[in-house]
Amino acid sequence: MDPMRRRAVTIITAAIVLLALPATAGAVTDAERADAGAAYIAAQQRPNGSVPAFSPIGSTSDAVLAFVAAGGQRSAIRDALRFLRAQVRKGHASTVGLRAKVVQAVVAAGRDARSFGGENLVRAIRSRIRDDGHIGRSAVFDHALAMLALEAAGLRPSRAVAGWLLDAQCPVGGWSYDAPYDAGADNRSCFDGSKDDFFTADTNTTAYAVMALEHGARGAYATNPFAFFRDARDATHGGWEYSPGFGTDTNSTALVIQAYASADRSTPSGGRVALRALQPDIACGGWAYSYEGDTPGPANVGATIAAVPAVLRLAFPLVPGGGSGAPRTSRGC
């Protein structure tokens, strides 16, 4: 269905669809939360198929993962892949990180990442692997994404590739977004004290690293990353912070829950409750990014994209048919 027409149908049918949902928030299941979130995302999709949040290509790729996790939204997936295919063909997805995002989306949607937009995206990532295992000159965050992409495509990263990420871990137990730990310059959180170092160990990069290593690693952590997650917990709202002092946010909470799932560990008590609390209005379906005081903020598409797989405890990489498979009808706020 044309995206504009689908949006119109959303407005007309929203009230009818919502009649099927439980009357109280306590009765809402996680599958229904995911369904409502996926519908909210679909309602934000633009006519060209993109779902822009943090970045058009990356966020659209992540939206496909959310749709697959929830099940359904087939026309939204098709339109998103059309957008991504066009971006690949135009050469706009040429970095390690963007290619990795697209590969995960394409594979999860049941398509061939080795022939997409005129490119073999899997080979393009593999061709960037250096002798030391580093995938190109990418940030630690993008290296972890690339490992997940290779794993999604059915490949097990080499010892060197996994070893590079293991060696990048900060002594505090987490990973920093940009650069690997430098024993000669960094403190335990991978901060060198200079005005040019903007990143310390954070929950988001750490969660992606854990998912990549738990799925296909060869080696062991130098420091337990789950101890890092424990210390990054926000005592006020019960979720996880990006880094100390930021407070609970949906994206960080979602990724940490997925990291626990990837290691087949139970989410710490209250963690999933904290994620659910940031989706205060099931009729809207969207998750807030974070709190405004003690109240969740407005619905945010980027936060909702992150929350949908996590509320179902589905870790990356996703496989085709990761959700229930039943068609859904999109709705908005």
Task: Indicate residue ranges for each PLM-predicted region.
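Bacterial N-terminal signal peptides that target proteins for export
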Residues: 2-12
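Bacterial N-terminal signal peptides
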Residues: 12-21
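Short N-terminal segments immediately surrounding and downstream of signal-peptide cleavage
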Residues: 28-45
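Buried hydrophobic core positions in alpha-solenoid tandem helical repeats
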Residues: 41, 84, 125, 165, ...
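Internal amphipathic alpha-helical repeat/solenoid segments
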Residues: 41-56, 80-94, 125, 129
